[in-house]
Amino acid sequence: LPEDFSYHFDVIENIKKQFGKDIVLLIDTCLCSITPDGHCGVTNHKTINLKDTHYSLGVAANTYLEAGADIIAPSDMMKNTTKYLKKTIGINGFIDAPIMSYSSKFKSNLYGPFREAAKSSPKGFDRSSYQLPVNDRERAIKSSINNAAQGADYLMVKPGMTSIDLIADIKSNTLLPTGVYQVSGEYASMTLLNKEKLGNYINLLHESLLVFKRAKADFIITYGARDIVSHL
């Protein structure tokens, strides 16, 4: 089972020591970059072992918080992860630690660049058993509602641009801050358009962020954060 997160502890602790309260650390809490088959949970015979997955995610979450993380962000999309983490971090003294759930995360073809960089492309079977089908609006909204009921403090749709139609309904049903994740494929498409002189990267990025705000996203996660800040 993945249960040694000492490397993550050292990185988080050193960042907080250097920047202190000038930085807020939201730590993606998942297993895909450390499991042998690239899945977001522990697998046995091409199926997810939910008990072992929750255990490892709990160890990770508590390790991150002990190191100084401000918010944990489970992105695994397994059943009842938010509920499990809320309980286990509470037992370890982090009852007030916020959880930002990747609550409406779709099985998408737009994650390719990240998976290549993290070497986390799934092997053996795909992620359709736990990530959402892109055509099921009702299930996606229900997923966020369920995560809110389990104790999530922040909700999210992912990928960003292909999910903006869900934000308003999720917010009205949960009354929780709901954001978007502009994923690696979205980001790469803008940089490639710029490279081929078919569009200006900064203009494309700015336009996409304005669309997220128009859709009432409360926060935006993007690989272009530092780029857009330098142009504001």
Q: What would you call each of these model-derived segments?
A:
Residues 1-232:
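Alpha/beta enzyme core
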